[in-house]
Design a protein with these regions (language model features):
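Short, intrinsically disordered N-terminal pre-domain segments
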Residues: 1-18, 93-98
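Surface-exposed ligand/attachment interfaces on beta-rich extracellular proteins
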Residues: 15-34, 56
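Noncatalytic modules at the cell exterior or secretory-pathway interfaces
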Residues: 35-37, 71-86
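Short, surface-exposed beta-strand/strand-loop-strand elements in extracellular ectodomains
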Residues: 40-57
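Residue-level recognition of conserved beta-strand positions in structured domain cores
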Residues: 41, 50, 81, 91-93
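Edge beta-strands of jelly-roll/beta-sandwich modules across compartments, strongly enriched
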Residues: 46, 85-95
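Solvent-exposed strand-loop boundary residues in beta-sheet-rich modules
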Residues: 52-54, 83, 97
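Beta-sandwich interaction modules
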Residues: 62-74
Length: 98
């Protein structure tokens, strides 16, 4: 990633959509139509994946953390709880052109 005279968060200024995925004992997903989005784990540590099922060995986001993600095309976000506590993966889509 390169940063040129801009703040890292400059491209994530204008939220345009909100999604959520229940992260429980089985994989759940939501289609995200934006290519710039954030994910936030609420209530539990969560395993997530983009475009394929979340498993015990896919990407990890700790409880109450927020990650900003940019992908080349719209995708599905898949979620699964990391341990025995259910949680929710909150997703905010951003307009990349504003």
């Amino acid at each position: 990633m390169s940063i040129t005279n801009e703040l890292l968060g400059d491209k994530f200024k204008h939220p345009v959509a909100a999604y959520s995925v229940a992260a429980a004992s089985s994989n759940a997903s939501v289609s995200v139509t934006q290519t710039d989005f954030s994910i936030c784990a609420k209530g539990a540590d969560i395993r997530y994946n983009l475009g394929a099922a979340a498993t015990a060995s896919t990407f990890y986001i700790p409880k109450d953390e927020t990650y900003f993600i940019r992908v080349p095309v719209a995708t599905t976000v898949q979620a699964l709880r990391d341990a025995s506590t259910d949680g929710t993966l909150l997703i905010t889509g951003f307009d990349p052109d504003r």
